[in-house]
Each structure stands twice: as structure tokens, then as C-alpha cells.
A protein has these predicted regions:
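Bacterial N-terminal signal peptides that target proteins for export
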Residues: 1-9
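Short, flexible, mixed-charge acidic loops at enzyme active sites
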Residues: 103-106, 189
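Vicinal oxygen chelate
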Residues: 22-28, 32-40, 59-60, 86-102, 111-137, 160-165, ...
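N-terminal signal peptide c-region/cleavage motif recognized by signal peptidases
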Residues: 17-20
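Core segments of cupin and vicinal oxygen chelate
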Residues: 27, 38-94, 132, 139, ...
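A short acidic/small-residue loop/turn micro-motif
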Residues: 65, 105, 178-180
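Short beta-strand/turn micro-motifs at beta-sheet edges
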Residues: 23-25, 109-112
Length: 199
């Protein structure tokens, strides 16, 4: 009980000393730094992102584990006996980084969520010429879906999209909007874009 009261008082004192936080932003938030993805085969993943997509490997480190305690669970919300065998970060042009994880865990599930599943996601790359991107991916034997599909109506009009997949099923997208999108005419907030990284 004393421990809980002491921690509550400490938290209140710290909050008071830091001043009022902005109600609409994490204090000091600058932008999206990276997206983390767990992969089944690190070598395959690094080769795909560097040799097919065109990203550059920045660094690798690991392993991380805790044989005796709950560090992995406490820090990452995974099984206490989970092991991160390796972490590799890649940089992909003018955009945030991708952090690749190779995990083992007693309760690990081997499934890739679809875009319609809760927790499903995809990573999109801006390209200057989406038809050329499609031809390139086809030439590399990458599985692509329908498209390139131009969006001609609504706020996203002006973009063209093409979904494709990594060899292990990760959903990816190529997107292009060389003349911008319709919403930009009247928008108070314009989305950040790798084609104009300074904006």
C-alpha cells in the first residue's frame, strides 16, 4: 500500500513539474520514425527489402531474451520466454524506416493478417511511375494484385495504387499521385509525401 501511495505521489509531482501537456499530441512528437514487422526468415526479408524494393540496410543487433524473468513480457507484451534473435533496420528512400524482427516464442502464431483483419496493415511506397513499378515487380516474380488502379472520384482522386506481397505474405502497396489528390485544394492539413519531403 505504501508503495502504491508513494508512486502515485511521485507521478503527481512529476506531472506538476512538467507543466500541462498538449491535449492533442504526444509531447515532442515529430513524426513517424519506423514500422516494426516480425518476419519468418530474416535473410529473406532483408534481401527482399534491399534487392527488390530498393531499401538500404542500416544496422542489425540482437539477440534479446530473459531466461529467468519477465523482461520480455514487461517491455514488449510478449511471452516471457520469447527471444528476439535479430533486429534489422532498413531505410527506404524519403520515408520512415522499417524495423524487421526475427522472433521465437512458445506461443508464436504463424499467420499473416489480411487487410480486412483487425490488426491487419500494409506498408505503402510512393513511386514516380506506377506502370513501371508494376512491370518491374512482375519481372522480379513478385505477386501483384489488380491494377494499377486509378482513383478518379472523391478526395483521393488523382492517386493510382497497386498492391503487392512480400514472399512471406506481408501486404505492400505502390502508390503514385504526380499531380496531387483532389482533397489538397481545400485541405487545412495536407498529408506528408515522400515526393515533397520538406513539406
Amino acid at each position: 500500500m505504501k508503495y502504491a501511495i508513494r508512486n502515485t505521489m511521485l507521478a503527481a509531482a512529476l506531472a506538476g513539474s512538467m507543466g500541462a501537456a498538449s491535449a492533442d499530441s504526444i509531447p515532442g512528437m515529430r513524426g513517424h520514425d519506423h514500422t516494426g514487422v516480425t518476419v519468418p526468415d530474416m535473410q529473406q526479408a532483408v534481401e527482399f527489402f534491399t534487392e527488390v524494393v530498393g531499401c538500404k540496410k542500416a544496422m542489425s543487433f540482437g539477440p534479446f531474451a530473459d531466461d529467468k524473468g519477465t523482461f520480455m513480457q514487461d517491455l514488449l507484451g510478449v511471452d516471457p520466454k520469447a527471444v528476439i534473435e535479430e533486429i534489422t533496420l532498413v531505410r527506404c528512400g524519403h520515408g520512415s524506416n522499417i524495423e524487421l524482427f526475427k522472433y521465437t516464442a512458445p506461443d508464436q502464431k504463424d499467420l499473416t493478417p489480411r487487410n480486412s483483419d483487425i490488426g491487419g496493415f500494409h506498408i505503402a511506397f510512393y513511386v514516380d511511375d506506377i506502370a513501371a513499378a508494376k512491370a518491374y515487380l512482375d519481372g522480379k516474380g513478385v505477386k501483384t494484385r489488380m491494377g494499377p488502379l486509378p482513383v478518379t472520384e472523391g478526395p483521393a482522386a488523382g492517386q493510382t495504387i497497386l498492391y503487392f506481397q512480400a514472399p512471406w505474405g506481408l501486404q505492400l502497396e505502390a502508390i503514385s499521385y504526380p499531380n496531387g489528390m483532389a482533397y489538397e485544394k481545400d485541405a487545412e492539413t495536407v498529408l506528408w509525401s515522400p515526393k515533397n519531403p520538406e513539406k
